[in-house]
Amino acid sequence: MPLKTLLTGLFLSVMCLVPPALSQSAQNSRDELIALLGRLPEIAPIRNQLVAQGFQGEKLALAEAHSKRVMTDDLIAGYIADRLIALYDGRLSAASATEGLIAPLYESGITHLPVKELVYYHKVQRVLLDGMTPRDCGLLVKGQLRPARMEDVIGRAEARLSARTLKEFYRIQYKAMRLGVTRAPRQLSPAEAARIQTVIFEAVRKRVESASNAKALSNTLENFERARNATACEAAKIFAEAVLDITGRDQQKALLFLSAP
């Protein structure tokens, strides 16, 4: 995703720029970081990487505009500035700094989206898996892709989306990030989570049983991390499709379950 490249650039930039700022007042430090974020698309241009991932024409313009919109949003930039200050105060570990700058916004904000947008978001996430090789897809869903490789794989998959889909996907991402600044993740109660998990697993079971490779898929779901990449990818797609097919009063709860960090 383009934003992670920008944030990596930001992290490297503030290694030099933040310490002097922190010697001043906290508010001055925060204001300077927000200003730096606004200039980040110029300091750490990502156009070449986007082109290498397959973005071109309207889709390239959309990706660049999305990154700029996020970095120049005072609400989001203020949140990231606070995280950077926490990093230098020792309240945020450097090991998780670049991921931790913005990931919490997604994790929280997505859970506050209206059902229609939440459905759209997860449908696009499902389609992105089709834009990857079975190996990359399997490693991704098993959480075994190196960060740099994961960024590239997801970027290339996003570049395969239509411009119309990409535009709406970015709009929803931006909205989720703004929601995530001020709201904690919406969570199901333990009882609701247990009930909806049963509903989801039953839906997944029915889909798996109807597949030609039902036994392999069943074994994969029981021991996901050690499964073959291609089968893990297929199982992840089935799981996502089963959740997206749930309707009625359970729909939102199933989507919240799917959105849990």
Task: Give, region by region, the residue ranges found by the protein language model.
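Sec/Tat signal peptide C-region and signal peptidase I cleavage site
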Residues: 19-23
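N-terminal Sec/ER secretory leader and immediately downstream segment
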Residues: 24-142
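Long, contiguous all-alpha helical interaction modules
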Residues: 50, 79, 143-157, 245-247, ...
